[in-house]
Amino acid sequence: MSFRSIVKLSLATLAAGALALAPGCSSKPPKPEEKPKPPLPVVVPAPVPEKLPAVMLGIDVLEADGFKEVAGKKIALLTHPAGVNRLGEPTLNVLLRAPRTKLVALFAPEHGFDGQIRAGDNFGDMVHTPTGLPIYSLHGKNRKPTPKQLQGLDALVIDLQDIGSRSYTFNVVMRRAMDACFQYGVEVIVLDRPNPLGGLKVDGPPLDPDNWSGVGAHPRMPYVHGLTLGEIALMAKNGSAPISQLPASSDMALSDKVREKGKLTVVPMRGWTRNMRWPDTGLRWIPTSPYITTYESVIGYAMVGLGTQNTDWTWGIGRDFAFRGIGFPKKTPDEIIAAMNAYKIPGIAFVKRQGTGADGKPITGVYVEVTDWDKWNPTELSFYMHKQAARWSRLNPFTGLTSEEVRSFKIHVGSNAWFAELQRAGGRIDVPLFLKNWEERAAIYREQTRKFRLYPWGDTPAGK
């Protein structure tokens, strides 16, 4: 059978369940942070949509097709609060009513099964109280399912909402889970979901293979990759060496024999095209982590997340505008706007906006607007932030770093050459030279991944 899953798109009734996904998970509290972090934003549940979204998610298609991919199987589910159908019903609930299917365990990615654990914090196994099912942590002492956890399973179902940026760890936890399942003869079933940035933007530095880590598992993948998790899964299993095989030192370096033997099924969406951004889907955004609470923060993560690496740049305006606001110590909003406007970065504008400070009082900061989506290159701002940080700092902030700081920068940004040039040139670095090189390599990556794309372009000309 082709690695593209073929799904008969027959219509079925989509029922909403009553079982809450997050409540009832019991565990020890996460370890305290070494550095103070802003308070977690309050997440207000969105209402059930008045109009049925046009896009059917993988879980919707699975149910519409009569659950045939899981029928007669003992399964586990890797998911989080954003793993819901198009009505907002948790995938957990949907699978619990699947006929002739036995759901026996749950797995949780970074941020936990309830999505409230801060970035980077480890957590242990717990129990989902409403069902009594075990929840195995994949962001603690184990980063992939163990043989004991997989014992007796026929399939692991994965339903995770990604945000389209390479360092967001859900594509990594998926790959690690796939590796474990392939090694121990367990099928992987990926329920596909939209890339909220769409499937056209491919941008930023590719991941140098030696920079593999928990925030980067796919060699030569640009920071904004333009793929869905289902497409990434197909690439990880069936791709050739340049884009799928990691160095032997990696804990995700499977042999070709094991990868070929592994069984992967991707249940694709219906109605999604590559030119669709999240608002075009008609789906409501459910937070994927404590600070990615809106579609606006998804955009910001791609835009400024790398710019804060090993610099004094900060994101947010007080408690508000996660990843959309930017600040720099001892620089006023006007000074920041003037400095960044001088670079004439296409597709964005810097404006003053009011947020809420830590003391609850109003605070003014700089907000980054996307003014022209077609001209906007998602990651470009981050590299001018690096350049400006070196200009504003008394000493080059990219020299004199510890080995851990160097490693952190490289695994997030991906490019050894960019870091080396930052160390050498500091504020004199030639950003456009690197942007041009990365654009050329992004075009190559588009061609290398073309055969794994499951969805048409939409009304945008092919090849873009």
Regions found by a protein language model. Give the residues of each.
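Bacterial signal peptide processing site
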Residues: 26-28
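Glycine-rich, charge-decorated loop segments at or immediately adjacent to ligand/cofactor-binding or catalytic sites
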Residues: 115-119, 189-212
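Conserved anion/nucleotide-ligand pocket segment
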Residues: 212-301
